[in-house]
């Protein structure tokens, strides 16, 4: 059973789209980045939702492409003293929380996440304080300050198991920040959950009506859906899961066509694993010209070659992630609680977005 707060419609200002580079400029920046990675003892770690050329460069230079938690864990294990995180800001913070001794750089610190923006730490803390009998469970797509206020940090791959565990102990739950994922988990578990009203601007735009129409055009296609999508979209899915889980589903499902309802950046890695299959972008609510995100996170798009080269060459406060040590230690507690729980279940914890 879920208790949903009144939804507040928030229109987030999107950053300007990066200026396209010529092929000559791209080649120049790539060569410079490769040299700087060696000079700075750095490794490039990119999220699935960054542009394909960024993911390709990360792999080519011995870096990594993955979801949010995988990125932080790779950086923790890698011997490089500097991590350049191509993603959104909470991902850089997560890397710093797990690996405080390393220098964490980002192409820009202005790459936000609507889930993070929609869950300010002060407001969320007030809400939690008003319900002191509730266990606070937050999605990894949050700031270090919100994580520090939580009892548990979860990823979408283990959220169901943790909520089932808490529900078995008759613990009411505050869930934040994604209302769609919270509703999905509440419906699956029957747990008593109060849901914070955040959403991902990309997944919130997927349309069930438009998806049904697309399915009629591709009747033999499987539908893959991220659980940050509206319930009406999730109900149409053949597979529901995090980025890593959707990539796995694309490989395992016996379909030659896949309609994919998540950020289209995922197509780079997905197509690598299933080159023989046709991947089709799921339709957004805007049906073309009127969509806002159009199935690609506007903040992920800020992680361009020029910005990466600048971060490596200049560094400084415009690019380096710092997390207050007291806050870092406090936020590490609920994160380790999840990792310990996963170890007990012998589960491999994957990230979200």
UniProtKB/Swiss-Prot annotation:
Enzyme class: transferase
Cofactor info, note text: Binds 1 [4Fe-4S] cluster per subunit.
Binding positions (iminosuccinate): 47, 68, 139-141, 156, 226-228, 243
Keyword RNA-binding attached: no
Keywords: 4Fe-4S, Cytoplasm, Iron, Iron-sulfur, Metal-binding, Pyridine nucleotide biosynthesis, Transferase
InterPro entries named among the record's database cross-references: NadA (IPR003473), NadA_sf (IPR036094), Quinolinate_synth_A_type1 (IPR023513)
Binding site for [4Fe-4S] cluster: 113, 200, 297
Catalytic activity from the UniProt record: iminosuccinate + dihydroxyacetone phosphate = quinolinate + phosphate + 2 H2O + H(+)
One annotated GO molecular function: 4 iron, 4 sulfur cluster binding
Gene Ontology cellular component annotations, sorted alphabetically: cytosol
Keyword hit for Cell wall biogenesis/degradation: no
EC number(s) from the headed UniProt entry: 2.5.1.72
Record-annotated disulphide pairs: none
Pathway: Cofactor biosynthesis; NAD(+) biosynthesis; quinolinate from iminoaspartate: step 1/1
Cross-referenced Pfam families: NadA
Subcellular locations according to the entry: Cytoplasm
Cofactor(s), names only, from the UniProt record: [4Fe-4S] cluster
GO process terms (BP): 'de novo' NAD biosynthetic process from L-aspartate
Biological role: Catalyzes the condensation of iminoaspartate with dihydroxyacetone phosphate to form quinolinate.
Similarity remark: Belongs to the quinolinate synthase family. Type 1 subfamily.
Protein name: Quinolinate synthase
Gene designation per UniProt: nadA
